[in-house]
Amino acid sequence: MINILYAGSVSACFELENNTAYYSGEKYNVRLNGEEVMTSDRNVFSLYPLKPKTEYTVEVNGHEPVHFTTISEACAVSVKDFGAVGDGVHDDTENIQTAVNCLPQGGRLYFPEGTYSTAPINLKSHITLDLAENAVLLGSTDVSRYPVIPGTVTDIVTGEEVHTGTWEGNAIPMHQALLFAEHSEDIRI
């Protein structure tokens, strides 16, 4: 049996169900819409690049075919269109953040091959970050570039404690992550 683990706008991930961990024990061929696209021996495999809002059939020898449809997207833009350089030296933080801020719901931000040096990026709901093969987000080594999020703050109207972040279930101060999302959903990376 083939299980669909994920189907985005331009990629999909599948699990080959069997009695072994990680590897299937033998190589198998994967066909996408009848065309052989890969050979693998891993229980989990991904297919990309795919086209948004398109019907596909995946076949693996000895298993029932699986039909799925990729999701639609509002637009797909390159981070380089916002001035990101991707050379590992230039600070691309503002360029990446501007691109994220400009994405509409359902938008996809594409990172071509390169190394994008950055401080934390604030994400938002209903977007996709799509990194090409050999595209790297290189986090700054300067800890002062990572804001500290207090574990709790006080609501100025009600006086109640508001949790702003937790570490292993505890509301304690912590540095913001390289990719950060608060009160957000449906973010695909």
Question: What positions do the PLM features span?
Answer:
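Extracellular/periplasmic carbohydrate-active domains that bind, remodel
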Residues: M1-I189
